Amino acid sequence: MSEVKMLTAPVPNVPWQDRPAGPQNGAPIWRYSENPIIGRNPVKGVARIFNSAVMPYGDAFIGVFRGEQTNGIPYIYLGHSKDAIHWDFEENKIPFVDENGDPFMPIYAYDPRLVKVEDTYYIIWCQDFYGAAIGMAKTTDFKTFTRIENPFLPFNRNAVLFPRKINGNFMMLSRPSDSGHTPFGDIFLSESPDLVYWGKHRHVMGKGSEWWESLKIGGGAAPIETSEGWLLFYHGVSGTCNGYVYSIGGAILDIDNPSIVKYRCENFLLTPEEWYEERGFVPNVCFPCATIHYSASGKIAIYYGAADSYVGLAFTKLDEIVDYIKTNSVVTPADTEIGRR
């Protein structure tokens, strides 16, 4: 097994549960035995929390959570935890403001990602901007949340920032499309010097040839910087006679030019199998949005939305998952090119 290192700040109190005994099929990922960690009706007026992002904050953890209100409109709620497993939520949705400090709430907001770049925390979500589009905000204290200009035109979803600048610029993955529900579904990379003006758009990877990602794909958790490249957990979607199936996939992107895919796992890493993944408001969904990881031990905790109803937690080790992705890698010419045509 190759020795792979995380090039990230240490988080010694990463949530963890050892691999269960007995044979294991497929990828070296195992579910938390007490899943789901967030159930139904977690907050007054909120029916379901899912597709949410968490990260270390001080000596504890903080998160931004997709809360599906009882009226069916999604918003983003703030949560706090001492162990990143048991969460307390603020009853009011996050109060976004504009650059002048005046209230500036999106019509709706869902599927947030949370990424720290330098000394600022960024929230990226999907919202209505004359169609499905990317919304962004920043905070330094999780008290004031200032909206940033919309980075892209509609239609676009599943955006996530890289956790550091590359070649002096912010980098963001996203999935543009020609409608809100993505007749085409490839991941693209864009860069910006200031989070306002975005360009140098590059194709990263397209839907795969395997059944689990044959319809579309989309970015998931913020990429993890490693000695092998950027480790990306993403989602792949297949279509069945009973609707979509969302699975978790893995890829490794070039460290200096993330539009180049070095390795891409042919197999899914996690697919709906447990009751909380197969049964819910939208059945058969595993949707990754965040990881917490410890560089010294290689431990990775993966947070994912389950069946649009719950939050699940899974675990892996860096060297094992990288080896699995490399051993089972199948890349296409479109994956390995620089993505400029």
Where are these regions (language model features)?
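Catalytic core of Fe(II)/2-oxoglutarate
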Residues: 221
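C-terminal substrate/ligand-recognition segments
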Residues: 289, 293
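Beta-rich carbohydrate-recognition and catalytic domains
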Residues: 1-107, 115-215, 224-284, 295-299, ...
